[in-house]
Every structure is written in C-alpha cells, then in structure tokens.
C-alpha cells in the first residue's frame, strides 16, 4: 500500500482502516476531529439517490460497520454520526441535536436533499458520502 502522506495530509492506517487527516486541521485537535476515508474496500453509502434503486439491507449493514470501524479508528462514538441524504443541491442544514437515540442519524427525512451539515455541538459527528 502506497503512503499518500505529503506536506498537506497524513495517510493513516489503523485497525485496517485507511484515512487522511489534514496537517493544518490537526493544529485544532483540541476542538476538531476529522478523517477522510479513502473508501478502499469500504462502503460508506447508506442510501442511493432517490431516482436509483435502494440499497439492500446487507449493503446498509456493511456501510454501518464501515462507519463504526472508522469511528473506532479516530476514537469517536459511532452513535454520534449524522449524515445527510446528498442530492447535489445547494442545501446545507444546521444540526443542533440527534434525532435517533441509540443509533446514528442515517437516511432521515430531516436530511433529504441536503448536501452539507454544520454544527457547533461537540457530541455531533458529521459525515458525508
């Protein structure tokens, strides 16, 4: 496996999960945790576009496991994930609290046709595909 690290990013492989972290963002590690998965042998798609065929239960289960593995690698709580249903729009929503209690906020109507999320809450972990 080729190391993709350079002057801007660090390529990390931890517990079988590969991800990138930006050196500049790491300067704010006291207030920000970030990771950009390489998606190598991983499936982070919890839904398909509204015009496409829905994903299978098995695909959804695999995506959830892959998100959980990534969260474990960066020492974050998988249940704190909030992920929009992207549709290549200009829509961005603010997230103030979780909708679900004991599972991530995936595929929720609240985030239909939303391509970005913002928050200032420390217990909300934002994700996209």
List PLM regions with ranges.
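Phosphate-centric recognition/catalysis
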Residues: 67-129
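Short, Gly/Pro- and small/polar-rich lid/capping loops
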Residues: 1-18
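N-terminal short beta-loop-beta anion/metal-coordinating cradle
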Residues: 14-26, 83-92
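Glutamate identity and glutamate-enriched acidic tracts
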Residues: 7, 27-30, 53, 58-62, ...
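A short linear-motif detector with a strong N-terminal bias
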Residues: 13-17, 60-64, 106-108, 116-117
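Intrinsically disordered, low-complexity, positively charged segments
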Residues: 21-71
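Polar low-complexity intrinsically disordered regions
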Residues: 1-3, 58, 84, 102-103
